Amino acid sequence: MVSKKIILIAFILVALVQIYVPAKMIVDRAIVLSSGKEFKFKIAPIDPTDPFRGKYISLNFNENSVAIQNKGNWENGETVFVLLTTDSNGFAKIRSVSKVRPLDSQDFLKAKVNYIAYDGSKLFIEYPFDRFYMEESKAYDAELTYNRTLRDTSQVTYALVNIKNGESILKDVMINGIPIKEIVKQEQQNRK
């Protein structure tokens, strides 16, 4: 009888943990989206689409490097904290990069060192939000629209990212202030 009670209690505890872990992950992301500071990261052109990558737009950012003094202090793939500010147009700018998590209320995000320039003068950053997943029926059209607007210098294309306490969530990809999903939807309706 006692062993059945212990098994029942253990089962309940395991079930609660299995519910708690994904619920906490969802709540943490919802908090970043609802109360995190929004940044606009200007997007740079990338290579043509890779058909093996799946249903997302691969993003590359203009603001992805920072000047460094000593390349020996940095290693490819290591976690870094990117302190951010915004320029006069409201786009994200890297203020500095640190190996230590900032303690004060500065705007920062956790990222990785992508690589260090051959001459050691720049550190390139790999952001955790370099893929924008889309509904399967719209992904291909979105990729075409995205690539077309990047070639047109009169178009302003950027990623809208919410950031709070180092965590970041890619909210949307915008073209001239309009979500890419809406542009693709409109283009698909116009073709009908």
Where are these regions (language model features)?
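Aromatic-capped interface at the extracytoplasmic side
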Residues: 21-41
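Extracytoplasmic
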Residues: 36-38, 56-58, 77-79, 154-158
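Short extracytoplasmic
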Residues: 40-71
